[in-house]
Amino acid sequence: MATISNETPLWRLQQTLNHILPQSVRKNEKHLAVVHGPTQPALWEMTLGELLEFQCLRYRDLEAVVVPWTAARWTYGQLENESSHLARGLLAKGIQRGDRIGVMAGNCEEYVSLFFAAARVGAILVVINNTYTDAELKYALSHTACKLLFIVPRIGRHDLKNALEDLHSPDISKRLPNLNETVMIQGSFKSFGTYKDVILAGNVVPLSAVQRRQDTLSPFDVCNLQFTSGSTGNPKASMLTHHNLINNSRFIGDRMDFTEYDILCCPPPLFHCFGLVLGLLACITHGAKVVYPAETFDPEAVLRAISDERCTALHGVPTMFEAILALSRPDSFDCSQLRTGIIAGAPVPRPLMKRLWNELNMTEFTSSYGLTEASPTCFNAFTSDSIATRLTTVGKVLPHASAKIINPETGETVKIGERGELCMSGYQIHKGYWGNLEKTAEALIEDEDGTIWLRTGDEAVFNSDGYCTITGRFKDIIIRGGENIYPLEIEERLTAHPAISRAAVVGLPNKHYGEIVGAFLVLEPGHTCPPDDEIKNWTRQTLGRHKAPKHVFVFGLDPRLPLDMPQTGSGKIQKQVLRDLGKRLVGEE
């Protein structure tokens, strides 16, 4: 039963009495790098199906989901109705509580309907990365034992014909014994059923059956598996609950001052927390509207959506914003309503931020930090924070969450102002990795008070006001001659050069120093490449000599490189790919 109160049992929140005290920093933690979010507003205790029903009571006739590339415009009432019909179809297909349903598709209204339909019948939706190869798709289906797969023939330029042929082969039941059926969420392929077929199959199932199933569910049930973008080994599937997602998305929307009058343009993909939680659910929890401008990221479609839909917010990673700003805008372009949004996934160069402010009117943009295992957001700036704060920090910890910074070797909490590994605790921490107890035990640690902490693997520092600055990934730190070099400060210096749009700095092997600095660059449109010496001298003007890049590689100019910076499907730069590439190009000197 849905409730909105602050009487949730404390053990469910993995919190002790100390954990929920309202003080930002407690007396016995003075000077230590420990911060606690506010305890108000109270956490919501409901399932995703109950959330949608609850919001329909207030916003039934307001638009909830708009998809310009399919011409879909669904109100809250239509979304509830569509997901109810699909939920009946899932019951007709024999889906039980806890069964896994996979989806691999671009941003579309059917994806949103499936997300809520699966949640309403107690299934776990496995969102599969659009960029996965055939082998990675099969691994995801096998690892999570999906019973149903919803898929499309093509996602942008990614042709899935070979994968579909394999899924249609006679021996697929031997290789994927749990997969009962493949369904085309859009389009068609041979004898596979379609999304509409599933809805038709549900006509024999009464709506009351969906309600009965929904009444058996708990907000603390796992409802979503999201694969982490690990650099080595098979990806891990993070187990996220209704409670995780609903409350995290609420607090994200609160930081952007969302109301039912807001309209979010959301280019990030639905298979990622950015598009699903910070996008879709941040809107649903506030009665706002989400606009998915294209199947995959298309900067021209984003500009059209901002103008045509009168969007008030825009999400993206820095590379998306750079692509948007690189386009010429027609005279009719109107971004006068645009004010806020979240920029995440990578540090934001100051020149880019100035352009977002001046050219797109994003005066209330917010910086953010999160990871899949934390549902995802841990820290988010306020729209009222100063520009300097939003540029140099990721804001303050969200409500009902705690954060601390530890010495990664000793586990001891460091002092405020000292760098260390960021750890998170609170309602938003995932239940672990699906089918991987070993990795779960490595990431989730219990302190002497019985509080569970998630080790993020990210290096961070807190200031005396509780604001957090992410200083890098521990695995990305370059150790040159025994001295730690932090790539982020070099990247920020490089992108301050007028000719450099993006920079990624990695450590390359060196016999004498162990590692040396390598820089991969993308130039600003219309600029010529500065000589290597100029780039090194530019770095040395503000940083130590040893931090200047020994090797410089420029995308678009070096024929040995791909055309653009390698990224994950969610827009994060793949530094492991760059390290491997640099190692092949220069060897070990």
Swiss-Prot record:
EC numbers: 6.2.1.-
Gene Ontology biological process terms, A to Z: fatty acid metabolic process
Keywords tagged on the record: ATP-binding, Ligase, Nucleotide-binding, Peroxisome
Binding site for CoA: 481-483, 547, 555-557
Positions contributing to substrate binding: 372
UniProt protein name: Acyl-CoA ligase SID4
Motif PTS2-type peroxisomal targeting signal per UniProt: ranges: 12-20
The keyword Repeat is annotated on this UniProt entry: no
Record localization: Peroxisome
Positions bound to ATP: 228-236, 367-372, 458, 473, 572
Main location: other
Family under the similarity heading: Belongs to the ATP-dependent AMP-binding enzyme family.
Lineage top rank: taxon: Eukaryota
GO molecular function: ATP binding; medium-chain fatty acid-CoA ligase activity
Taxonomy of the source species: Eukaryota, Fungi, Dikarya, Ascomycota, Pezizomycotina
Alphabetical list of InterPro entries matching this protein: AMP-bd_C, AMP-bd_C_sf, AMP-binding_CS, AMP-dep_synth/lig_dom, ANL_N_sf
Inducing factors: Expression is induced during iron deprivation.
Gene Ontology annotations for the cellular component aspect, listed alphabetically: peroxisome
Entry annotated with the keyword Nucleotide-binding: yes
Annotated pathway: Siderophore biosynthesis
Gene that specifies this protein: SID4
Function comment: Acyl-CoA ligase; part of the gene cluster that mediates the biosynthesis of hydroxamate-containing siderophores that play a critical role in virulence via intracellular iron acquisition during macrophage infection.
